[in-house]
Amino acid sequence: MTSATTVKTEYEAIIGLETHCQLSTNTKIFSSSSTAFGADPNTNIDPVCMGLPGVLPVLNEKVLEYAVKAGLALNCQIAKYSKFDRKQYFYPDLPKNYQISQYDLPIAEHGWLEIELLDAEGNPKRKRIGITRLHMEEDAGKLVHAGSDRISGSTYSLVDYNRAGVPLVEIVSEPDIRTGQEAAEYAQELRRVMRYLGVSDGNMQEGSLRCDVNISVRPVGQEKFGTKVEIKNMNSFSAIQKAIEHEIERQIEAIESGEKIIQETRLWEEGSQRTISMRTKEGSSDYRYFPEPDLAPIEVSEAQLSQWRGELPELPAQKRHRYESELGLSAYDTRVLTEDVTVSQYFEAAIASGANPKAAANWITQDIAAYLNKQKLSIAEIGLTPANLADVITRIETGKISNAQAKQKLPELLTGLSPEKAFAGQELISDLSVLEPIVDEVIAANPKELEKYRNGNINLKGFFVGQVLKKTNKRADPKLTNELVEKKLNG
């Protein structure tokens, strides 16, 4: 591939994402079968999702609620009148030979999502990505190919219809994205929003969040878009970024060598780190959409819309802005704290229990985060409650214990030991009448070091401080010890 650094200034990429989010309802969109992941193949099925004769779909009201809340969170206009349509196509994973989706009257459209990237200095760069539309639809089944990850090259294929009829919202962005990094951040922010709302778990490994990328390149300054290529089969955020970066280079190289870019669907191959051609891209006319005759149109009342709007939580971007402006936290800390709703809830509970916000942020984003990563735990699984973290921070700030003592006891605190028991009998010695004789004793016991210090080796002050801490089992107040040692050495 041509090095991207020699051509990025001459070309720009035009990128949009189509994201399917599986909604966290207990039952399917048009029937009562379970949506539970991991069930034995073809056990969560029923006559409706299998398209058997004589049955009719009935809309799951929770799907409409979740779709509207997602649309509101993405700053969309909610349609007062909407409907479902049949999308016709033939594939083994589609038992009815059509999918119930929405075409010309989606439930939500014309919104935006703010993304935030940090520069090398940690300063946030924010950008709004337009949302073209959000619509409801049912998922298809899942093909399992023996001997390959797709039909080509497999010895046989099996179909699991458990996923057929699982509710989805498809969110289509405007072509406002320019880089793979922006695309990956957009997808991550979208997942954060869905998780904060509680409408989707966004687990990519379970297929709850699936992204397709539409990408073209054009010379900088040209208004007309280039030929669009769709990329599928990206199963992680890093794969989204890498697939886009590869495809940008591929298209630029093709243009500069005189090749014509064709409108097609390509697959991202994780193993070879490249995209390969899958099929020519279909247009909407290929699907022969028409209104779904078995479902009534949808009307959302002002009262219902107002109720759902009032139930929206504070969203990730709103929290980041508040943490920075009101609590004085860095952009990096706010990103870590808002990445997962349970982390932000823990942080806010610690503050409510009296913790200094900056100190709480430091403990959560550094020491506690390192423990969680090492143990592969979530913050909800640790034994250190927010109230106990606040207790530890208060003990440090009031001089009862040192930061070093707290870090030494952290592993036990994280497994449930209370601060009272952890620091029993370990309060810092800050009484001059107790500390001064210990300092005098240490200085008297090290005459050679004292002579070297007074001859100009002032770095030896740390030696004397260390000896005092050692003698007191690290219970000597560090600040007071430093002041007292310096006074005695220079006396």
Swiss-Prot record:
It catalyses: L-glutamyl-tRNA(Gln) + L-glutamine + ATP + H2O = L-glutaminyl-tRNA(Gln) + L-glutamate + ADP + phosphate + H(+); L-aspartyl-tRNA(Asn) + L-glutamine + ATP + H2O = L-asparaginyl-tRNA(Asn) + L-glutamate + ADP + phosphate + 2 H(+). Belongs to the GatB/GatE family. GatB subfamily. Its EC number is 6.3.5.-. InterPro entries: Asn/Gln-tRNA_amidoTrfase_suB/E (IPR017959), Asn/Gln-tRNA_Trfase_suB/E_cat (IPR006075), Asn/Gln_amidotransferase (IPR018027), Asn/Gln_tRNA_amidoTrase-B-like (IPR003789), GatB (IPR004413), GatB_C_1 (IPR042114), GatB_Yqey_C_2 (IPR023168), Gln-tRNA_amidoTrfase_suB_CS (IPR017958). GO terms for molecular function: asparaginyl-tRNA synthase (glutamine-hydrolyzing) activity; ATP binding; glutaminyl-tRNA synthase (glutamine-hydrolyzing) activity. Heterotrimer of A, B and C subunits. GO terms for biological process: glutaminyl-tRNAGln biosynthesis via transamidation; translation. This is Aspartyl/glutamyl-tRNA(Asn/Gln) amidotransferase subunit B. Gene3D superfamilies: 1.10.10.410, GatB domain, N-terminal subdomain. Pfam families: GatB_N, GatB_Yqey. Keywords: ATP-binding, Ligase, Nucleotide-binding, Protein biosynthesis. Disulfide bonds: none annotated. SMART domains: GatB_Yqey. Allows the formation of correctly charged Asn-tRNA(Asn) or Gln-tRNA(Gln) through the transamidation of misacylated Asp-tRNA(Asn) or Glu-tRNA(Gln) in organisms which lack either or both of asparaginyl-tRNA or glutaminyl-tRNA synthetases. The reaction takes place in the presence of glutamine and ATP through an activated phospho-Asp-tRNA(Asn) or phospho-Glu-tRNA(Gln).
